[in-house]
Amino acid sequence: MNKPLSLAGLGALFASCFIAANAHAQAGATLPTFQNASVHDPSVLKAGDTFYVFGSHLASAKSKDLMKWTQMTDGVSATNPLFLNGSKNVYTELAETFAWANTTTLWAPDVRQLADGKYYMYYDACQGDAPRSALGIAVANSPEGPYVNKGVILKSGMWGQASYDGTVYDALKHPNTVDPNVFFDNAGKLWMVYGSYSGGIFIMQMNPATGFPYPNQGYGKRLIGGNHSRIEGAYIMYSPATSYYYLFTSFGGLDANGGYNMRVARSTNPDGPYYDAQGNAMANVKSDPSKPLFDDASIAPYGVKMMGNFLFERKLGEAGTGIGTGYVSAGHNSAWYDPATGKHFLIFHTRFPERGEQHEVRVHQMFMNADGWPVVAPYRYANETAATVRPEFIFGDYLYVNHGKDITASIRKSQLITLNANGSITGAVSGTWRKVGTNQVEINLPGASTYKGVLLTQWDETSKSYVTTFTASSREGIAIFGSRLIPRTDMQVATAIYNELSLGATTAVTGNLTLPTTAARNAVISWTSSNPAVVSNTGVVTTPASGSVNVTLTARITKGTATLTKTFTVTVRKLGGLVAYYAFDGNLADSNGAFGAGSVSGGKIDVAGGSLTYGAGMRGNAAVFDGATGVRLPNGLISSNTYTVAMWLKPAQLTAFTTTFFGARTTDSWVSFLPMGHGGVGGASMLWSGSAWYDAGLGMNIPVNQWSHVAFTVNNGAVNVYVNGVKRFSGTNFPNVFTTTTGTFALGVNYWDTPYKGAIDELRIYNAALNDAEVAGIAH
């Protein structure tokens, strides 16, 4: 039996883990810094020493190093500088395009510099719910504009009329004229590849002197897709390293639930034919017209899948913070080859696990494997260079991801494997590995031919350290990633778990507790309750009929031969009571005494700063918010699916999406009360939940510069919202958000939107759903 370690010993062991972390990989000399930008469908341009990306909705950004991006523009508007030229703007310049496409926005463009030194933007607009689109050219002397329209070159969606090939437009076989990529081939010829869903991806030859298509090509030549198959975002890159042209596309739907994933095929000619690693002709890849629209199953087996939804999951006790590093619906990429360094880059947008539809640009380096197929570095580019990887930095535990071949919204979470010194692989999968040359690797696993790829040293943003990674793909077109974990002994792992293990807010528990049973490196946590009738060994809570009961929970952490124990005191309270009361009488204290005081934040929930003041309230003082300040409340204020939130509000102004009370389990699961809602409820005040969207519009706005009492009750999905004691909304199936005792809560701010300006007073939180009379009582 192992002797429990003292707290002093735990701290020393944890410190030694941290020190060792600096020597577990062939680390770079400096720590990388990143600055993020949001450009959907980023198309890359190198002009001088600056990289530009241009994307949908006229968004753009620039960077000197592919790591730190500066947002230049975002959103189609009359003031967007890319088209602003005196009295002219994007709406006047592209009036024909907007009129044809029945829209006021733009889709993914591409910008290329031609022989005259000018920059040619290939812009496009689409109706959205139909492939009625226009694609044209605008020209500027600088990548940053202003661009001057030269005219539309292609249209689609001319229902019942002759299309460019002389036949009546048919969306099953003719393209949607969007998503252009213009490129020079190895012989100096200019081409444009384009298309999205509908009839597929097409390519046509362009005149390098004018940038316009050569005549009599119709829509050009189809390369892949058709019958409304979900294939889009085509981009072609030539690699001198292999003498192949690589056709990148994105399969699936672009939103967080669409299963977007990047794939590649190759050809010795710019206009094909293109083949995948199994030798399948991509021209034959299309949906089955006899099946329902957007038939993903028919196209999923084809192409070399480079990346799908994944998460290098950080488990309890592993280095770093948060859930780990991963992507959701990464795609619509561009690519760039650097002739000076021989590096290949993949530039794409991505969403993220537990962050909904938020998206940012990411750049990853690509490497050509032994079979001439590009494999993508698992982590974002941090100025790494392929180099010899020494054996002592290869052996060890890895987080392993197999991207599969399917099109799915599911996130593939990492598994734990070990690359052993004898060439075996053990853990979640079994197989063999061997290093080839300086940094090539071959990995043999069940279910596929040999995975061929590279080993490299990369910056891991989760552990904030350099780690060894591998990336490889098989002849079946399946990609795998690996990320080496910091070497630790069993006791070091157990110690790290001990230090991080927490149950969150445990002073006013009324709902079931989430008791973790697994942790880093497959460690096991078992639980024992001092009073199973109140809190079971699995965290099931039975509330007392009156008062409160204290329960001791003991966690036993086991990793190999190492064992540690940690205890927690949990206070379980009766249902129906007030659990928190913030009166704001000159401070942010909980007058009920169950929770700690709030703290002042800046203009976002996770940003420091802010300046909170106090003024006259409904009772005593109130908290006064200046439009740049929030209040961070204690975690775990609500931890069940039965609760009431009540407060007095006096907004100084109404701005869309601005929150007053905000609570979240994650950035993708939250509840928010808005004095002014979105357009879906006509801008009315609303209780809002996402990203399992729920709109509880009140049909009115609480007034500016007047006090209004707002309350909402939730009872296992039944929801009611009240203003001044009067029920304004009643519904069912409200999302169950607060399933843990670690939820995040705030007033006046969230992660994204304009902060609240006005006053808040008398915030009360109950662990029960008050009835109509009870709500009316606290409102008067």
What are these regions (language model features)?
Residues 239-241, 706-720:
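Localized edge beta-strand/strand-to-loop motifs within extracellular or lumenal beta-rich domains
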Residues 576-579, 588-592, 626-685, 704, ...:
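Extracellular glycan-recognition modules
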Residues 686-709:
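Short, aromatic/His-centered strand-loop micro-motif at the edge of beta-sheets
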Residues 731-759:
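Flexible glycan-contacting loops in extracellular carbohydrate-active proteins
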Residues 488-575:
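Beta-rich interaction/scaffold domains
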Residues 358-360, 722, 751-760, 772:
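Extracellular carbohydrate recognition
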Residues 2, 573-627, 776-780:
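Extracytoplasmic low-complexity segments
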Residues 26-492:
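Carbohydrate-active catalytic/glycan-binding domains of CAZyme proteins
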